[in-house]
Amino acid sequence: MMKDGLYDLFCESLESLALKPGQQLVAALGGGADSQTILDLLMRFRQQNPQYQYLAIHLDHSFHPSSADWSSTIEHAAKSYGVKTVFEPLNVPIENRQSKEAAGRESRYRRMAELTEDDAVLLLGQHRNDQIETFFLQLKRGSGPKGLSSMAAIQPWVGSRRLCRPLLSVSKEDILSYAQQQKLTWIEDDTNYDTRIERNFLRHKVVPLLEQRWPQFGNSVLRSAKLCAEQQQVMDELLQEKLYKAQKHKSHFPLSLLSEHSAAMQRALLRVWLQGQEYSLPSYEQLEQIRLQAQSATDDSQMQVQCDGYSVRYFQYALWCDNNTGQLPADCWLAEANVNLGEWGTLSVPDALLTNNNELRLTFSLTSEKLAKPGRQGRKKLKDWLKQAGIPPWLRARRPILELNGKYVWVAGLGWFSYQVIEKTEFDSLQLPEPDWVSSGADSYRQL
């Protein structure tokens, strides 16, 4: 492929995104010929399209002894274009049974999401050869149509961000040819030849042998991946419609769907529900645990199937996702209207509560005393009010509570509670605006 042909293909890919003026286009730089080609193509595109924002990011997780030198070389090449750059070291936590490569990839994507605007497009240098290798890796894992679809040319990312792979149909040979014609500088990572790494084994040992025997084998793999993607898209659209009609709340999976369908359809519906919650999909074994336990679950059974970073629970004829990952904030006295609760979100309280020498405290501790609510008869314990409100047991101790002058006056999800506070004035007659609690996602009840 001629270099202008590659540039035309790149432009077509970006034009399909329906970009808006001021939108951020970000080149993810790894240092290889593919990402350096992406940067060069993007800079050519910038000359004709100055209406967008442009950024190049390189994150060094120091897996290779020469990574610091590589970063310097990559940074010098990027800055020669006069583009805004971010070059950072990256600490990569590696969990049990997680490969170094997978941990590095997750950490890179997480940090790049933090460094980019909400509607940014992240441009990746993955190409035809990468797509073929990905298909084989998914095949090895026993994946269905979704996994065998491999990588999408354009896919949603975090928030309104998108990932874009303009070179996905281009061979590595054509990319190298372009890089040489453009006199680009890139890094040759010697670990790419280590066949102990699965992808490298496929790249150097398996795929060349298959294409030597069947020259069109690679094209057949790409066609199969595309057909799997189309099949998955149709299936998802049909399942989402069925799920939407049965749901009362987007965050819940109604168990009535399980009783109406076969085991295969049950698993498919559960997958599409979890995908809609933006969680990683469970393994087949985990999905089967969820399906089987849900069929016999009761509110007293305390069903909990642990998945990757979240668990699936049962409450009131529905399944819920619980992604609590940390400890609750410590109790604290409030002197300001806005409180940052870390991963538990933010809380904004009315200024009136901070006047008249009031002592205002934030707590997550459930009181055993009985409380009254404005306009409601009788007094109940807080746990009973929470139960009546339909809040699951595991979330009842995760509600921010305001304590004014030693008395509970407000609970997230329940609103104001009533008692005499100032000059025998009933608290509910003060008509204060509700505090505003915005969860960061640690509370699965946030979507109700």
Curated annotation (Swiss-Prot):
SMART domains: TilS_C (SM00977)
UniProt keyword Nucleotide-binding present: yes
Family, as annotated: Belongs to the tRNA(Ile)-lysidine synthase family.
Catalysed reactions, as listed in the record: cytidine(34) in tRNA(Ile2) + L-lysine + ATP = lysidine(34) in tRNA(Ile2) + AMP + diphosphate + H(+)
Location relative to the cell: Cytoplasm
Residues involved in ATP binding: 30-35
Database matches in NCBIfam families: lysidine_TilS_C, lysidine_TilS_N
Cellular compartments per GO CC: cytoplasm
The UniProt record lists the keyword Transport: no
Main subcellular location: cytoplasm
InterPro entries: Lysidine-tRNA-synth_C, Rossmann-like_a/b/a_fold, TilS/TtcA_N, tRNA_Ile_lys_synt, tRNA_Ile_lys_synt_N, tRNA_Ile_lys_synt_subst-bd
Pfam family, one: TilS_C
EC nos: 6.3.4.19
Keywords, sorted A to Z: ATP-binding, Cytoplasm, Ligase, Nucleotide-binding, tRNA processing
Domain notes: The N-terminal region contains the highly conserved SGGXDS motif, predicted to be a P-loop motif involved in ATP binding.
GO molecular function: ATP binding; tRNA(Ile)-lysidine synthase activity
GO biological-process terms attached to the record: tRNA modification
Function: Ligates lysine onto the cytidine present at position 34 of the AUA codon-specific tRNA(Ile) that contains the anticodon CAU, in an ATP-dependent manner. Cytidine is converted to lysidine, thus changing the amino acid specificity of the tRNA from methionine to isoleucine.
Protein name, entry field: tRNA(Ile)-lysidine synthase
